[in-house]
From Swiss-Prot:
It comes from the Bacteria. The keyword Isomerase applies. Catalyzes the conversion of L-arabinose to L-ribulose. Transmembrane segments: none annotated. This is L-arabinose isomerase. InterPro entries: Ara_Isoase_C (IPR024664), AraA_central (IPR055390), AraA_N (IPR055389), AraA_N_sf (IPR038583), Fuc/Ara_isomerase_C (IPR004216), Fucose_isomerase_N/cen_sf (IPR009015), Lara_isomerase (IPR003762). PANTHER family: L-ARABINOSE ISOMERASE. The gene is araA. GO terms for molecular function: L-arabinose isomerase activity; manganese ion binding. CDD domains: L-arabinose_isomerase. It comes from Clavibacter michiganensis subsp. michiganensis (strain NCPPB 382). Belongs to the arabinose isomerase family.
Length: 505
């Protein structure tokens, strides 16, 4: 049994330096020393989230090919960074780049920041040739169709490190999805279209394994929870949450809280034993469960599990990826759903929530643990955490199956404080203003056919999802402050043509 983690500590990125034997041993030694220094600066930078491992300078085709194969075989290696310190004839890179299956970043940099104007000679020029060595390298990558991110500048520059760090987080999300197993308890909500999808194609495209288990397999785990285990979990609830009086020990609804704890214990046991990193439930398929899982889902998401409601495994995958990509950053990631609008002119905003399952990592406050009726599902009143999402920048992201490909849509948003308290709304919630405005955002979202379930991340911005989609060779449409509906509609049409042509080629 393995506990879920979002840590990036077990991941590493290899730092590669290109050159050639033409330069001689003395120059190649300088290349090695200076490239080690660049790698060291990255490794020691606080905004670089993954370990950087320097590799010996690559000077010929055989060593480059072997490096690519070794990287492919290394589970902990989530990507490669390459820099051509000198001129490295790009035909040497063909076999290696063609074989490479890991995310790739081309760092266009050099050892020095400023030119030593008064002392520059031809030895300096021959040693520091990235300005044209990387152009040769860029050509062969483009000719081979290598998917990569290109970052330009010195690693001492904050924006350069930030861009590299963002790509590393995307590569970590890609690695996490590739090792992800999703357990679906029951099927999709009946007659719902957008939560459907091609699970076989998803395994081919993203590496994720999605399979279904009968809900009563989970019920057996819930029923096996012991009184001692439940007591310990209820003790934990009392330290973390403001519990409604009727749910406390001795209260008339305390047994409902204990059953909610049993659901959490059963779910965690099932997921850990099966090595799952994400799961789905459906209120239409609850088997012998007495409550729709609410509190348990919220707490498991907070630990790092992906989750999708109503059988929505695509959103569960996105949430798991977002949890890993945001590792160590303030904020959180959660299932979210656009519910209703505030349409007062000049004040337009969206109220988002779900029946129960919003992750408490979206708040720094102390949630309230409550019990209320639920009008669907036909079961006992479920327990859940209630809170307001912290104000601040965020992004909401959805995935749809468009028949011939998957499409990811991301909207940059600003979570805002509630205009007034919501004393009669018994669920966790978020209120946000979408960029560029509600009318344009909603029209673009509908034009894209984006899903009504999303992951809301307050940890990472849209650039992480841009890098993730690029690594995955998956369509991404972004709605932000620069979006116009006319331009967005054209982009949707262009993308349709491009992705269909790309598949054919």
């Amino acid at each position: 049994m393995s506990r879920i983690t979002t840590s990036l500590d077990h991941y590493e990125v290899w730092f590669l330096t290109g050159s050639q034997n033409l330069y001689g041993e003395e120059t190649l030694q300088q290349v090695a020393e200076q490239s080690q220094e660049i790698a060291r600066q990255l490794e020691e930078a606080s905004d670089i989230p993954v370990r950087v491992v320097w590799k010996p300078v690559l000077k010929d085709s055989d060593s480059i090919r072997r490096m690519a194969l070794e990287a492919n075989a290394s589970d902990g290696t989530i990507g490669l960074i390459a820099w051509m310190h000198t001129f490295s004839p790009a035909k040497m890179w063909i076999q290696g780049l063609d074989a490479l299956q890991k995310p790739f970043l081309h760092l266009h940099t050099q050892a020095n920041v400023a030119l030593p104007w008064s002392s520059i000679d031809m030895d300096f020029m021959n040693l520091n040739q990235a300005a044209h060595g990387d152009r040769e390298f860029g050509y062969i990558q483009s000719r081979l169709g290598v998917v990569r991110k290109t970052v330009v500048g010195h690693v001492s520059t904050e924006s350069v490190r930030a861009s590299i760090g963002t790509w590393m987080r995307a590569a970590a999300g890609w690695a996490a999805v590739h090792e992800l197993k999703v357990a679906r308890f029951g099927d999709n909500m009946r007659n719902v279209a957008v939560t459907e999808g091609d699970k076989t194609e998803a395994e081919l495209k993203f590496g994720v394994s999605v399979n279904t288990w009968g809900v009563n397999d989970l019920v057996a785990r819930v029923d096996a929870a012991t009184d001692a285990e439940i007591d310990a979990l209820v003790d934990e609830y009392e330290t973390l949450y403001d519990i409604q009086p009727e749910l406390r020990r001795g209260g008339e609804r305390h047994e409902s809280l204990r059953y909610g704890a049993a659901i959490e214990l059963g779910l965690r046991s099932f997921l850990e034993e099966g090595g799952f990193g994400a799961f789905t439930t459906s209120f239409e398929d609850l088997g012998g469960l007495r409550q729709l899982p609410g509190l348990a889902v919220q707490r498991l998401m907070a630990e790092g599990y992906g989750f999708g409601a109503e059988g929505d495994w695509k959103t569960a995958v996105l949430i798991r990826a977002a949890k890993v990509m945001g590792s160590g950053l303030p904020g959180g990631a959660s299932l979210m759903e656009d519910y209703t609008y505030h349409l007062v002119p000049g004040e337009e905003k969206i109220l988002g929530a779900h029946m129960l399952e919003i992750c408490p990592t979206l708040t720094t406050g102390r949630p309230s643990l409550e019990i209320h009726p639920l009008g669907i599902g036909g079961r006992e009143d479920p327990v859940r955490l209630v809170f307001d999402t912290d104000p601040g920048p965020a992004v909401v992201v959805a995935m749809s199956d468009m028949r011939d490909r998957f499409r990811i849509v991301a909207n940059v948003v600003e979570v805002v404080p509630l205009d007034e308290p919501l004393p009669n709304l018994p669920v966790a919630r978020a209120v946000w203003k979408p960029a560029p405005d509600l009318a344009t955002s909603a029209a673009a979202w509908l034009t894209a056919g984006a899903a009504h379930h999303t992951v809301m991340s307050t940890q990472v911005g849209v650039e992480v999802f841009e890098d993730f989609a690029e690594i995955a060779r998956t369509e991404l449409l972004v709605i932000d402050e620069d979006t116009t509906l006319k331009g967005f509609t054209k982009e949707v049409r262009w993308n349709q043509a491009y992705h269909r042509l790309a598949q054919g080629l």
